């Protein structure tokens, strides 16, 4: 379903570009070329970008790519995100492309805020929401995560919404990857309230919408002592939750029928 990007949601565009966007220059596109890559299931999400700014959406079996390089749409997008880009490497690139398009660069406030849609767009690019099966009392743990190669922006996110850090080190390259993750019910519900105001536009929004139902089911389980009934209730819930394999296959089939991929 196509959802119009309203003025108060423009921070989402900046957050998405910060998380998984790329700004390039070439001989054929001297004014700049913006590219954003998402999963196959997020085809409609990038079609929303195309509707607002023009450009093109290309789908392959591995994902969906949005590319914008025509002058009018590029300038409109730059005006919308100007002053909201936060990742240093992106700020540098936006400064370059603004200069080439005669746009005065603006810089964001030092501290992040929950009063913009930036965090929603950033989550759509690098976030995940899963239920992990733990060995402790066979518990099913809801986990919401932001992943990044650099921890600077994650520290700023932690200041406003909490969470805990996990550092993954690649033993071969010695490089670090950082994850800011949330398991606390209070913190996750705070994020849920934020997403109600500034919705995720990626397919993972389906899971975000199920957060209250997850906690209701967790509470219900404490009063049910029939293991078979518990298993039945969880299976029914997980049919709604586990869209990944089923819906990625279905999305692929639908896009084939539309002639988007072959």
Curated annotation (Swiss-Prot):
Coiled coil: none annotated. GO terms for biological process: intron homing. It is an enzyme of class 3 (hydrolase). Keywords: Endonuclease, Hydrolase, Intron homing, Mitochondrion, Nuclease. Belongs to the LAGLIDADG endonuclease family. Mitochondrial DNA endonuclease involved in intron homing. This is Intron-encoded DNA endonuclease ai2b. It comes from Dictyostelium discoideum (Social amoeba). The gene is ai2b.
């Amino acid at each position: 379903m196509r959802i119009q990007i309203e003025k108060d949601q423009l921070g989402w565009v900046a957050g998405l570009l910060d998380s998984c966007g790329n700004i390039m220059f070439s001989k054929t596109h001297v004014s700049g070329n913006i590219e954003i890559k998402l999963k196959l299931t997020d085809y409609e999400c990038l079609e929303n970008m195309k509707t607002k700014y023009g450009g093109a959406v290309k789908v392959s079996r591995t994902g969906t790519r949005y590319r914008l390089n025509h002058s009018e749409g590029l300038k409109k997008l730059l005006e919308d995100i100007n002053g909201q880009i936060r990742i240093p490497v992106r700020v540098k690139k936006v400064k370059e492309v603004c200069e080439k398009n005669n746009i005065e660069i603006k810089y964001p406030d030092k501290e992040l805020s929950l009063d913009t849609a930036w965090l929603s767009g950033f989550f759509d690019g690098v976030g995940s929401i899963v239920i992990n099966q733990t060995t402790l009392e066979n518990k099913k743990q809801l986990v919401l995560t932001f992943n990044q190669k650099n921890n600077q922006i994650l520290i700023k996110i932690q200041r406003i919404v909490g969470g805990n850090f996990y550092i993954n080190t690649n033993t071969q390259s010695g490089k670090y990857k950082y994850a800011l993750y949330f398991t606390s019910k209070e913190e996750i519900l705070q994020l849920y309230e934020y997403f109600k105001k500034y919705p995720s536009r990626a397919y993972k929004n389906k899971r975000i919408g199920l957060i209250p139902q997850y906690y209701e089911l967790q509470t219900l389980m404490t009063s049910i002592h029939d293991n078979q009934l518990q298993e039945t209730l969880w299976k029914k819930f997980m049919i709604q939750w586990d869209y990944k394999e089923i819906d990625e296959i279905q999305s692929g089939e639908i896009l084939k029928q539309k002639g988007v991929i072959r």
